Amino acid sequence: MKIIDALFAPGLTGFYFDDQEAIKKGAVHNGFWYEGNPQTPGYKRIRQKGEAILVMLVLENGEVAYGDCAAVQYSGTGGRDPLFTAEEFLPILENEIRPKLIGLELNSFRNLAHIFDRELTVNGKPLHTALRYGLTQALLDGVARAQKKLMAEVIAEEYQLPVIPEPVPIFVQTGDDLYTNADKAIIKRADVLPHALINNVEEKLGRQGEKLLAYIKWLKKRIFELAGDEYRPVIHIDVYGTVGLIFANDLEKIAGYLATLAHEAAPFKLRIEGPVDMGSLWGQIEALSKLREIIDRRGIPVEIVADEWCNTLEDIKLFADHKAGHMVQIKTPDLGGINNVVEAVLYAKMKGIGAYLGGTCNETDRSAQISVHLALATRPDQMLAKPGMGLDEGLMIVYNEMQRAIALLKRRGGK
């Protein structure tokens, strides 16, 4: 089955592009807006609409394969590729990429993904991560349609993985609405919750960590109030390095605080994402490796999750090699081609470290659906409900696609 045409259209994501540098320097909120001047090249405002480019591959039989190019909320910052806008990148797709797609035989996802993710260059440079992300999604969908298979089945077959028609735990994020959205997550029986966005010491963590401790107390009580004794979600809190700030990155003290949180969270399993941010890749790897060692030695029932400085496939491999944490987040758009997402999950599992197939609130419904198929094939420990920050919408998109795929896999005899 060949591609006979390729179409591209501007789209919207589930959230916004935010200039992280300007926000760190004290940009002031005005409603949902930020006042002030952008600090990162490419930004015209501190907060801009989240943009996507919608990829449509027309196949010989008239079917259309879909994928969406998208970037993370903090596009253009933290060493990432430049800010991703449709205006800038649509011409590249139309003029440089479209001719290379037309006439391609859709016979192997891995081979095609390798070409567009790792070999193809424009003006001597690799394609933007967002372009590689969306193009490889569409290519996977195209191969699946050509073979009359689910995308999960294509990944399983090409990477020699078993087809297991069972759900992968879904992790929801509350955003700043810590209480109402936690209620929503509990009512809908989310597998992992609430993320909680603990990104500020004064407002959210507390100078002694007392505000987060109080929130976990409230959350545990609320789970029992709304759901009774049968519901046992994992409590997963992202602290954005703030715990390290209040303890001056003293790992023994941090471990002691995490032990207090774990005691309060019991009987629920506790994960803490990003306990420290050491400001560099190797500093982060060393700190999380030591912190994991302390936690394991002391028998503290908490798992730490690597996020900061763990961005590319190469980064993820380094964190896994050095056991820098109990789990690594795989931020799907930052990896470029979804072939790298598959490799990242499989590498983490091979190394005995937890795999969290994450991403960003700033993706699309389509990229989230395709992430579901990657998760069903590779079996990470959890995946993110995305896109958006409203909780309900992202959970609906991911949960429903997962249930559809599982039902079809069962019908086809997946075991």
Swiss-Prot record:
One of its GO terms (molecular function) is metal ion binding. Disulfide bonds: none annotated. Its cofactor is Mg(2+). Mg(2+) binds at residues 238, 273, 307. Pathway: Amino-acid degradation; L-glutamate degradation via mesaconate pathway; acetate and pyruvate from L-glutamate: step 2/4. The record marks 195 as: Transition state stabilizer. Keywords: Lyase, Magnesium, Metal-binding. The active site is at residue 331. SUPFAM superfamilies: Enolase C-terminal domain-like, Enolase N-terminal domain-like. InterPro entries: Enolase-like_C_sf (IPR036849), Enolase-like_N (IPR029017), Me_Asp_am_lyase (IPR006395), MeAsp_NH4-lyase_C (IPR022662), MeAsp_NH4-lyase_N (IPR022665). GO terms for biological process: glutamate catabolic process via L-citramalate. NCBIfam families: B_methylAsp_ase. PANTHER family: O-SUCCINYLBENZOATE SYNTHASE, O-SUCCINYLBENZOATE SYNTHASE-RELATED. Belongs to the methylaspartate ammonia-lyase family. This is Methylaspartate ammonia-lyase 2. It comes from Carboxydothermus hydrogenoformans (strain ATCC BAA-161 / DSM 6008 / Z-2901).
